[in-house]
Amino acid sequence: MKVVPSLLLSVLLAQVWLVPGLAPSPQSPETPAPQNQTSRVVQAPREEEEDEQEASEEKAGDEEKAWLTASRQQLAKETSNFGFSLLRKISMRHDGNIVFSPFGTSLAMTGLMLGATGLTETQIKRGLHLQALNPTKPGLLPSLFKGLRETLSRNLELGLTQGSFAFIHKDFDVKETFLNLSKRYFDTECVPMNFRNASQAKRLMNHYINKETRGKIPKLFDEINPETKLILVDYILFKGKWLTPFDPVFTEVDTFHQDKYKTIKVPMMYGAGKFASTFDKNFCCHVLKLPYQGNVTMLVVLMEKMGDQLALEDYLTTDLVETWLRNMKTRNMEVFFPKFKLDQKYEMHELLRQMGIRRISPFADLSELSATGRNLQVSRVLQRTVIEVDERGTEAVAAILSEIIAYSMPPAIKVDRPFHFMIYEETSGMLLFLGRVVNPTLL
């Protein structure tokens, strides 16, 4: 029986301008012009040409900047839509708490795409909702993610740490080009591993991940297939601080309604001040904005009626969220918000298949990753996300027309029933984390 090597992917999460030189205008040897005439006759057109060239370069540069800005905005928008689609798939299998990172999943799958060709590459792009980004620029997607990673890492107030590992079996021949591109775009650290000794490999990889996530994910891997050749791991650690922290003195145990019949007691935080919010009449939901330091925001979506939160998921899109944000009004309000901690782990392989990414196992074409790429398969796509929300902030690892009405908001919003939350980086519009809380006391 032939053993097919398996590729295991786990998700935790220069531009050169070449301008031709201008050749000097030739002068006729038969009729040499006096020096002062040469200056007037030849130099003036050259100055005009140089001015035209500079104007052309400036215009091209402006067009390139505008195009890159539009591409970054489209990347953020489509990654959010991918996240909402993935939420719907997860929700079909899980009726409880949900939390994951659309950004982390897109980052890892784009990293895998560096080694993919043919139908495998096409399906990954479509599954991530990124097929519309300029297909004539093959390095565009990883370049955009690289720029986004660098922007996020420079924001020290944000408290976001992102990294990537490639655990490679010691005898497995990975193409140097793939490793170089992974390092260039995703700063991937390559670590040799002996997967034949599965228990030792599991222990070492868990040690690496535990260290990089600062103890938040001490045990990512429960078991390792000894036939594994390569494991790609992306991790994201978010330690956000509220722009206006909740005062722990006012945190009290209160009632949280899981559904019409079941209630639980939870630590309920309290804050008073100016908060941005809106009310969507179509969906009968309150949308509350809780800002972090570093230009990051948590949006909390709270349905008026118990049990309607599942129906809302069918209509979540970037356009709907943008409509909410445009109609936000800032008012003096009281906010009651539960403390919670979630720790969720998803085998995303089947979920991604349902979203059209089928040619990663079997029949994957990873020939840009290895010379044996047509005999490889992605055996697992794993994401584990941990998020904790308290008085100080958040610590996390990993088209329908909506009618918005202006009305007198209630003096208080009390989040005492199931709700959705989204954590955005506002400058880029990137959706970092997305989740649903049904029971704040359960991981």
From Swiss-Prot:
Top-rank lineage group of the source organism: Eukaryota
Keyword set includes Thylakoid: no
Glycosylated residue positions: 36, 180, 295
Pfam families to which the protein is assigned, alphabetical: Serpin (PF00079)
Chief localization: secreted
Keyword field: Blood coagulation, Glycoprotein, Hemostasis, Heparin-binding, Phosphoprotein, Protease inhibitor, Secreted, Serine protease inhibitor, Signal
Composition skew (Basic and acidic residues), residue ranges: 56-66
GO molecular function terms attached to this record: heparin binding; serine-type endopeptidase inhibitor activity
Post-translational modification: Phosphorylated by FAM20C in the extracellular medium.
Annotated spans, Heparin-binding: 136-153
Family the entry assigns: Belongs to the serpin family.
Extra facts: Heparin acts as an important cofactor, producing 20 to 100-fold accelerations of SERPINA10 reactions with factor Xa and factor XIa.
Record's function text: Inhibits activity of the coagulation protease factor Xa in the presence of PROZ, calcium and phospholipids. Also inhibits factor XIa in the absence of cofactors.
Protein name: Protein Z-dependent protease inhibitor
Gene: SERPINA10
